[in-house]
Amino acid sequence: MDSDSINPKPISSVDEDYRPPLPPRPSTNATDPGSLQGQATTAITPVEIQTLSFPDGSRGTFSTPGPDSIPSPAESGGASPNRHDSSTSAEVDETASLMSFAPTMRPAGDIASLLAGELHKKSPAWKMLRTQSASVLPFEKGRIGADDRFVEFYREFDPLPEEYDEDAEEDVLRLWKSKLKHYLILSSAGKPIWSRYGDLSLINSSMGVVQTIISFYEGAKNPLQGFSAGDTRFVILTKGPLYFVAISKLGESDSQIQAQLDALYMQILSTLTLPRLTHIFANRPSTDLRKPLEGTEGLLSSLADTFTKGSSSALLGSLECLRLRKSQRHAINNTFLKLRAEKLLYGLIVAGGKLVSVIRPRRHSLHPSDLQLIFNMLFESDGIKGGGGENWIPICLPAFNNKGYLYMYVSFFDGTSGEQASSPAAAQGRSSDEEIAMILVSPDRESFFELKQMRDNVAQQLAKNGTLAIIQNATRVGRPKIHEIAPGSQVSHFLYKSRANVQFCMASLEPHFTGLVSRRRLMTTYHELHASIHAKHSHLKVLHGVGDDATSLAWTTPVFEFYCVAGPNVSRATITQGANKIIQWAKREEERLFIIGGGVF
């Protein structure tokens, strides 16, 4: 054998083609499969996602180390975390990661990302997301079709079939039970008087059960005021020989529902007066009151429907006035006072259900509940409004005097000419919100012609000086819009009540709350705020509510009550800032928004 093959030559520095031999390849059986790494490597670290709300109202989403995440290099002694012991340095090189020793690592629980230096830098995509999330409107989730109680609310006022055979009775009864709100009136003897839905033959048995329950508690000297069955609330109001019952699935408080039942009682008294009602049942406790109340069913139904749809006036116990300049309202009052008839008790001008002007005796004022009855009669029911022209109506105003009648002259205006309307506004192609009426109240039943002459004189003067056109223009403008009174505010709607004047103003329902369902959602939120802040033993002055579909705020002081609603992503700081702007606006515009004093004689 050649000696050169036995004794290799030493490696010369000039021999550049020589390469050292590779180390032996690790055996594939060096690592038992059962001991293979089951955790993620440090390059793919298990993380948890956390969302934080910052003091400025913004929100951020961050990755935080999971429970099995890597420790810091100091804790691991410089070794690669989460790796198994290996007998070779090659395995160390394969399992270690440069990210294991990155200076951005934090102990578990510290809220940071691997890119800690970029934490406070907001990307364009993030800014766009923030802009879009702030523009989400209240109840937008509900409008998409959430499975809740209001999905079928648009069918709430569909009438039940009046004629049906015995086979269809179960279906009709099922329709009756599907309604979210019921009102029942019956006598203490169990005689049915009125029901909002269904004929009395359909619900006679239900009324009998209700009467039995109420009588049982009255016999125990513990009058029943309400009880619950699942998500349904039963509220009872006893007024002498009459029982008023409300069955509600709308989430209203007992005090709110009792106020509604009391309004129905006032509606009955406005027709019968208290002495006559008492006399009827004193002689015959089992009297059927349907005959004396014949013709007023429409008034009761329209009032009940107003409550079911959601009435801001009923909720706040106050009136809404038409927004006018102080000088313009002053001119209307002066015209009223100058042409006042001798037998006049109250004089009012009303436009679209809002009070424009009122003149009254110095020591008398009209209660909001009485005006609510008048407005319901004029603008909600089809009786007077459908007739147009002029009307002479005997009426009892229970809050003023529940023992006798007053006589009310009502005349609707035809445009700005001051002439009497020959037909309702709808027949003339005008909105009912543009209807203008004059109401003159007298205690003298023989004062019709005197009040008619006063109406003609006042209408002629208002048309002559252009005030009637100003009133009509104000009704067309409608309620104030948020972007006009608080530019940049993210508040979507508000209610503001002046406690001293017992009057309120509200934002326009357009464009987001004009629908029946969206308006009911809005009013339900207001009912919840009102119930919470006025709850018995509650000392809340400011209440901030956060839900999946809306953010809300209630604020009460001795001077005002304020309620507002915004989108679900609006922060507390943002909605409070918007509320402050609106309240400051209301204080500046107080003499335009509210009637302060009115005309007094």
Curated annotation (Swiss-Prot):
It comes from the Eukaryota. GO terms for cellular component: fungal-type vacuole membrane; Mon1-Ccz1 complex; multivesicular body membrane. Pfam families: Fuz_longin_1, Fuz_longin_2, Fuz_longin_3. GO terms for biological process: autophagy; protein targeting to vacuole; vesicle-mediated transport. Keywords: Autophagy, Endosome, Membrane, Protein transport, Transport, Vacuole. It is found in: Endosome, Multivesicular body membrane; Prevacuolar compartment membrane; Vacuole membrane. Residues 27-53 have a biased composition (Polar residues). Its main location: membrane. It is a peripheral membrane protein. InterPro entries: FUZ/MON1/HPS1_longin_1, FUZ/MON1/HPS1_longin_2, FUZ/MON1/HPS1_longin_3, Mon1. Residues 1-93 are annotated as: Disordered. In complex with CCZ1, is required for multiple vacuole delivery pathways including the cytoplasm to vacuole transport (Cvt), autophagy, pexophagy and endocytosis. The MON1-CCZ1 complex acts at the fusion of vesicles with the vacuole, through its regulation of the SNARE complex during the coordinated priming and docking stages of fusion, and particularly at the stage of tethering/docking. Belongs to the MON1/SAND family. This is Vacuolar fusion protein MON1. It comes from Gibberella zeae (strain ATCC MYA-4620 / CBS 123657 / FGSC 9075 / NRRL 31084 / PH-1) (Wheat head blight fungus).
